[in-house]
């Protein structure tokens, strides 16, 4: 068994692992990264964010072709199979792997591919994919192993018609009807994707409102557009059992309902990838979902071991994970790059997409904050009309007296891009955070960003 010494060893090469490794390497530390796949990128690149967003992009293009009257001069609506659409995602994955492999090489970061486990607080043993065992000794270690779909013991995921959000990418046919159990972010995104391919989707929600952490108006808009695309949303339902049959799946609900479909996609929760790390050897405990508790510096119970990304739970976003990993390494190298990551915009890639940052109306009302609302509807925006993207709106919440921007909520075309302008203003200190910025700033025309100016005028006109 060969022994290699490093300053920092990072377990996982997803967004959190990459962020930690790059920051430590640029600070002059000798760094190694371990991943259990034969390629870098983590779950985000291979099974999560990248393939699902690439799928969504392809489906949006199909939907635009099939609904835009101009294209009727070319031909009738076209329908594509799920495997056909998946091919475009596979091309993006390959490009991402090539790019990220280059990042590690340029920064002289050693990569190991295999299963890592702790021998002690400074030693990690790696069983490489070729069977060779390597021992990595480091002063500091960052756990960034990510998460995987939660699989309850009473659901038979070996059945060929029962999938989770990882295995759905191996779906070799296009089901006529699909049950999606779990109406969180992933469930809603896949409901949009499959309904866009003409699949009849039953979306099972354990709660009484979709994505209740969103502003209520945005959540209601999402519900409307999913239903408008033939997604049947069933609220306040829980499964009794899931029965795999020869030609599909039967979902038995506690309410007494039975639903049959060609396949079932399980999207109800995630579990931290910690069960094979040997954490019991170093005294680190995990919660019931396999997640590790950390302090504000992303340090675990063991002083030289840090954790970041999905493996620590909230907010479980690739964007936040990258910053958490970078901040964890910043705590290690003390180069001033540490910050506690809590100001994170929400990006939900449904069709249409959603993005928000800051407080919702519900939160401000409960806190008795005197706020006002400014709105811009995309159907009136020149750029949206040109792009034939009339669905959506931008909503700004601001303080009636100080004019401070308190929240930005966007639904529709380019929402995840638009939100960052509001985020930049909200991050300004004192009087610099003001809705008047949007009034006193000249925006390019026609653009979607111009919605801020329209919404600001709308909101200020409500004051008296």
Swiss-Prot record:
- Record flagged with keyword DNA repair: no
Q: Which NCBIfam families match?
A: PRK05249.1
Please give the cofactor(s) recorded in the UniProt entry for this protein: FAD
Q: Which family does it belong to?
A: Belongs to the class-I pyridine nucleotide-disulfide oxidoreductase family.
Could you tell me what the cofactor note in this record states?
Binds 1 FAD per subunit.
Q: Where does it reside?
A: Cytoplasm
GO molecular function term, any single one: flavin adenine dinucleotide binding
Coiled-coil annotated spans: none
**UniProt KW keywords:** Cytoplasm, FAD, Flavoprotein, NAD, NADP, Oxidoreductase
* The species this protein was found in: Ectopseudomonas mendocina (strain ymp) (Pseudomonas mendocina)
Q: Name one Pfam family in it.
A: Pyr_redox_2
Task: List the protein's name.
Answer: Soluble pyridine nucleotide transhydrogenase
Function of the molecule: Conversion of NADPH, generated by peripheral catabolic pathways, to NADH, which can enter the respiratory chain for energy generation.
Which EC number(s) does UniProt give?
A: 1.6.1.1
Catalytic reaction equation(s): NAD(+) + NADPH = NADH + NADP(+)
Q: Give me the residues that bind FAD, please.
A: 35-44
- Looking at the UniProt record for this protein, which Gene Ontology cellular component terms does it annotate, in alphabetical order? cytosol
Does the record carry NAD as a key word? yes
Per its UniProt entry, what is the enzyme's top EC class, as one word?
oxidoreductase
Gene Ontology biological-process annotations:
2-oxoglutarate metabolic process; NADP metabolic process
